[in-house]
Amino acid sequence: MKKELRERFASYRAGKSIKGTETEKNLLKAFAGESQARNRYVMFAEAAKEEGFDQIAAIFQETAHNEDHHAQIFFAFLEGGPVEIVAGYPAGKVGGTYDNLIAAAEGEHEEFVELYPHFAEVAQQEGFVKIANQFRMVAKIEKEHEERYRKLAANVKDGKVFVKEGETVWICRECGHIHTARQAPAACPSCQRSQAVFEVRSINY
């Protein structure tokens, strides 16, 4: 994170020190949680790639990038020095892609339903209004993460990652080949990569 942004987030303390507050502890818990989530998602991405789910691997990587930035935001509010916290974190393993997606969804759910709303309430009570708002904003993002993970998990479970109900436009993530059919081809006709490289084409520009 650039110095300019670190200073901007630090200004959210509104001239008050967070040392010794519950908000300080909650920020450190959030920083630790986001940092761990980032690393879990990188490992989940590797597992998805090995199973032939390149797009899901990319989504895990993208979400890991998001979590990394969340961690940096929470870290920017801290003032330094030792802080003791008591917190629980997932000690799960890297499983199959379906199980990894469900585990990720459950972690995101806990953050936006329980942890961050509570942290926001505490920050509000302690007079850190902008920090409270930051917890609420990140919570909304985690809600989107959960919804995406659950949709992807359903696709894996139902065998719909590479097969859709109607005619679908697929794109090769490697060479850009376009294929229109219910099912992605077993191999890309252009670059000969496996089916793993195909995803549903999305036009968002």
Could you describe each region identified by the protein language model?
Residues 2-205:
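Non-heme di-metal
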